[in-house]
């Protein structure tokens, strides 16, 4: 596997291999590989806590040395292009790039590079490692995906998580439904839109999405009322109590408590939000291993 850019580039076999390796790292069944003498640079052009820190911990556990990159102090501020920035890092011997960027499909500009790239999120396009860690979390709970009913609630149109998960979960055999305000519907994704209260007692997984304030613009924000959104699309205690006994609640985070989910439900028994974060570190180790080992996915 030369790069991890989009879930569309992964077969089901690739997905299972990556999550199984991550599960083996987590259980201790498989020894962590060490990449002593290898260098990685994390280029985050958008804010991040979980993804950035998770990659950093994963890299350190695998023996990688980080070449620090800060957008605010780099030559990007002087007008240097993304390609030239990445080509510079390749030229000085960096072995892996982890990139988050506000531009959809930014990686199309980097096709001439000879260095592995892990996409840590491109605009509202894709977020493959988030999708993979979500899949890992579901796999740990259910052992398979065939026939699972999954409800994804929220800002579908602007969510790279929704897009990545829809692509992968449908391919793996799950049934995916969306619930969203009309202005956040994404017609490019062929899934039914439902009212959350009509299906809340039937789903196996409720996947809540953060409201993407930074992508809405002035008009979108003017029309947003947190309380109204919570009442119509959020996971309230009443809705939580209607979930099936073995249903789980997921959220890619950061969580807007009291908007997407009642604050007291973030760590409720059915919630797997912090487990997702733990799994993310192991999953990203699996991805790094695949990219640096040169094995075919």
From Swiss-Prot:
- Quick check: keyword Transferase in the entry? yes
Q: Where does carbamoyl phosphate bind?
A: 50-51, 100, 127, 130, 253-254
What InterPro entries does the record tag this protein with?
A: Asp/Orn_carbamoyltranf_P-bd, Asp/Orn_carbamoylTrfase, Asp/Orn_carbamoylTrfase_sf, Asp_carbamoyltransf, Asp_carbamoyltransf_Asp/Orn-bd
Q: Where does L-aspartate bind?
A: 78, 160, 210
GO CC annotation:
cytosol
Keywords in alphabetical order, please: Pyrimidine biosynthesis, Transferase
Reaction catalyzed: carbamoyl phosphate + L-aspartate = N-carbamoyl-L-aspartate + phosphate + H(+)
> Which top-rank group of organisms is this from?
Bacteria
Q: State whether keyword Transferase applies.
A: yes
Which EC numbers characterise this protein's activity in its record?
A: 2.1.3.2
Report any one BP term from Gene Ontology.
amino acid metabolic process
GO molecular function annotation:
amino acid binding; aspartate carbamoyltransferase activity
Q: Which Pfam families match?
A: OTCace, OTCace_N
Enzyme class, spelled out: transferase
Pathway listed: Pyrimidine metabolism; UMP biosynthesis via de novo pathway; (S)-dihydroorotate from bicarbonate: step 2/3
**NCBIfam families for the chain:** asp_carb_tr, PRK00856.1
User: What's the stated role of this polypeptide?
Assistant: Catalyzes the condensation of carbamoyl phosphate and aspartate to form carbamoyl aspartate and inorganic phosphate, the committed step in the de novo pyrimidine nucleotide biosynthesis pathway.
Instruction: Give the record's subunit note.
Output: Heterododecamer (2C3:3R2) of six catalytic PyrB chains organized as two trimers (C3), and six regulatory PyrI chains organized as three dimers (R2).
Family that this chain belongs to: Belongs to the aspartate/ornithine carbamoyltransferase superfamily. ATCase family.
Q: What is this protein called?
A: Aspartate carbamoyltransferase catalytic subunit
Q: Highest lineage ranks of the organism?
A: Bacteria, Bacillati, Bacillota, Bacilli, Bacillales
Gene name, Swiss-Prot/TrEMBL: pyrB
């Amino acid at each position: 596997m030369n790069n991890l850019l989009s879930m569309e580039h992964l077969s089901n076999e690739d997905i299972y291999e990556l999550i199984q390796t991550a599960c083996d790292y987590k259980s201790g069944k498989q020894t962590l590989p060490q990449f002593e003498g290898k260098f990685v640079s994390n280029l985050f052009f958008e804010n991040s806590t979980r993804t950035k820190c998770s990659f950093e911990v994963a890299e350190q556990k695998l023996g990688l040395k980080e070449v620090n990159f800060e957008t605010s102090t780099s030559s990007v501020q002087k007008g240097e292009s993304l390609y030239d920035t990445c080509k510079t890092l390749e030229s000085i011997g960096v072995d892996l790039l982890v990139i988050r960027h506000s531009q959809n499909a930014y990686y199309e500009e980097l096709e001439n590079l000879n260095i592995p790239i892990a996409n840590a999120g491109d605009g509202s396009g894709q977020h493959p490692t988030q999708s993979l860690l979500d899949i890992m979390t579901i796999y740990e709970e259910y052992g398979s995906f065939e026939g699972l009913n999954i409800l994804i609630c929220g800002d579908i149109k602007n969510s790279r998580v929704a897009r990545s998960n829809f692509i992968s979960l449908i391919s793996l055999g799950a049934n995916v439904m969306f619930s969203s305000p009309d202005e956040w519907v994404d017609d490019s994704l062929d899934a039914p839109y439902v009212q959350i209260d009509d299906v809340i007692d039937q789903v196996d997984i409720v996947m809540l999405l953060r409201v993407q304030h930074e992508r809405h613009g002035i008009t979108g924000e003017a029309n947003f009322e947190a309380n109204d959104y919570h009442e119509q699309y959020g996971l309230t205690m009443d809705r939580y109590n209607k979930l099936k006994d073995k249903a789980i609640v997921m959220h890619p985070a950061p969580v807007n408590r009291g908007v997407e989910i009642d604050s007291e439900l973030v760590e409720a028994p059915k919630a797997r939000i912090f487990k997702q974060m733990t799994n993310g570190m192991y999953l990203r180790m699996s991805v790094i291993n695949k990219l640096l080992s040169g094995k075919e996915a």
